[in-house]
C-alpha cells in the first residue's frame, strides 16, 4: 500500500514537471534562438577584429615600446597613447573600424529585435 502511494506521488510529480516543461518550451526555444544570434554576432566581430586592429595600428603609425613591462600602469599608459593618437591626431583611423563594426552588427541587431530578444 505504501509503495502504491509513493508511486502515485512520483507519477503526479512527473506529470506536473512534464506539463511545466512543455509550457516553458517556447520560452526556451526563444532563449536558444537569441543566444544563437548573439553567438554568431560575437564570432563575426571577433573574426573581423584582428585585421581591423592591424589596419588601425598601421593607420595610426603606432609602434609600442618593447620594454613596457608587465605592470598594469605601464599597459594603461600604452593604451592611453594608442587611443590618444587615434582620437586626437588621426580620427579617421578610429572612425573607419567603428563604421565597419556597425555594418557588421546591423543584421544581427535587427534579428535580435525581430525575435524580441532585447529588453526581456
Curated annotation (Swiss-Prot):
Result when mutating residue 14 to D: In strain: M47
InterPro entries linked: ACP53EA
Pfam families xref list: ACP53EA (PF06313)
Signal peptide: 1-23
Effect of residue 27 to V: In strain: ZIM56
Keyword entries, A-Z: Behavior, Secreted, Signal
Listed GO biological process terms: sexual reproduction; sperm competition
Tissue-specific expression: Main cells of accessory gland and seminal fluid.
GO CC term, one of those recorded: extracellular space
Localization (cell): Secreted
Outcome of mutating residue 7 to A: In strain: ZIM56
Task performed by this protein: Responsible for physiological and behavioral changes in mated female flies.
Name of the protein in its database record: Accessory gland protein Acp53Ea
Provenance organism: Drosophila melanogaster (Fruit fly)
Organism phylogeny: Eukaryota, Metazoa, Ecdysozoa, Arthropoda, Hexapoda
Gene this protein is translated from: Acp53Ea
Amino acid at each position: 500500500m505504501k509503495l502504491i502511494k509513493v508511486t502515485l506521488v512520483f507519477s503526479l510529480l512527473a506529470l506536473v514537471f512534464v506539463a511545466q516543461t512543455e509550457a516553458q518550451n517556447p520560452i526556451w526555444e526563444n532563449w536558444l534562438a537569441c543566444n544563437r544570434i548573439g553567438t554568431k554576432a560575437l564570432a563575426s566581430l571577433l573574426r573581423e577584429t584582428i585585421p581591423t586592429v592591424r589596419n588601425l595600428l598601421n593607420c595610426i603609425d603606432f609602434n609600442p615600446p618593447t620594454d613596457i613591462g608587465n605592470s598594469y600602469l605601464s599597459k594603461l599608459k600604452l593604451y592611453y597613447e594608442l587611443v590618444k593618437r587615434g582620437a586626437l591626431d588621426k580620427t579617421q583611423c578610429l572612425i573607419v573600424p567603428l563604421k565597419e563594426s556597425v555594418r557588421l552588427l546591423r543584421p544581427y541587431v535587427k534579428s535580435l529585435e525581430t525575435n524580441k530578444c532585447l529588453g526581456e
